Swiss-Prot record:
NCBIfam families: small_GTP (TIGR00231). Belongs to the small GTPase superfamily. Arf family. The gene is ARL5A. This is ADP-ribosylation factor-like protein 5A. One of its GO terms (cellular component) is trans-Golgi network. It comes from Bos taurus (Bovine). Gene3D superfamilies: P-loop containing nucleotide triphosphate hydrolases. Pfam families: Arf. Keywords: GTP-binding, Lipoprotein, Myristate, Nucleotide-binding. Lacks ADP-ribosylation enhancing activity. A lipid is attached at residue 2 (N-myristoyl glycine). One of its GO terms (biological process) is intracellular protein transport.
Length: 179
């Protein structure tokens, strides 16, 4: 009886899960958002403020907020943290010069009270570019193994082709099932 109730509940439970997509400017956040929502590449320009789209996967609704990553906008990221269940950090795998800035912003976010229960998905974007940092290198630079208070996953991807994006969403879905 309990299994039947659970299955029926899942059919009609239309709870929305808030996701924020952050990262430095030109990392590919908006391209990823529109790959999720339209399954295609759209021409983007730097995001001033945010873009928001609802993504539905197997009756699970995600409200995804893509937040601008320019230096002048990063201080406002915390205004989006309330009720966030997942943080997607998009890393430009070709940008070795700013990986330390990404690490600094990541740990600022993780220290915020409103994100204490949020899961963390890191997309290592632009993996199609020769000479880019590998997932292992990015993991090491970001010191991901030191993160103990958040469930996290790093996923190689290419926003332009969509490669790797579904695996990231599958990880998020698996985290929801555990709760």
């Amino acid at each position: 009886m309990g299994i039947l109730f659970t299955r029926i509940w899942r059919l009609f439970n239309h709870q929305e899960h808030k996701v924020i997509i952050v990262g430095l400017d030109n990392a590919g956040k908006t391209t990823i958002l529109y790959q999720f929502s339209m399954n295609e590449v759209v021409h983007t320009s730097p995001t001033i403020g945010s873009n928001v789209e609802e993504i539905v996967i197997n009756n699970t609704r995600f409200l995804m907020w893509d937040i601008g990553g320019q230096e002048s906008l990063r201080s406002s990221w915390n205004t989006y943290y309330t009720n966030t269940e997942f943080v997607i950090v998009v890393v430009d795998s070709t940008d070795r010069e700013r990986i330390s800035v990404t690490r600094e912003e990541l740990y600022k976010m993780l220290a915020h009270e409103d994100l204490r229960k949020a899961g963390l998905l890191i997309f290592a974007n632009k993996q199609d570019v020769k000479g880019c940092m590998t997932v292992a290198e990015i993991s090491q630079f970001l010191k991901l193994t030191s993160i103990k208070d958040h469930q996290w996953h790093i996923q190689a991807c290419c926003a332009l082709t969509g490669e790797g994006l579904c695996q990231g969403l599958e990880w998020m879905m698996s985290r929801l099932k555990i709760r």
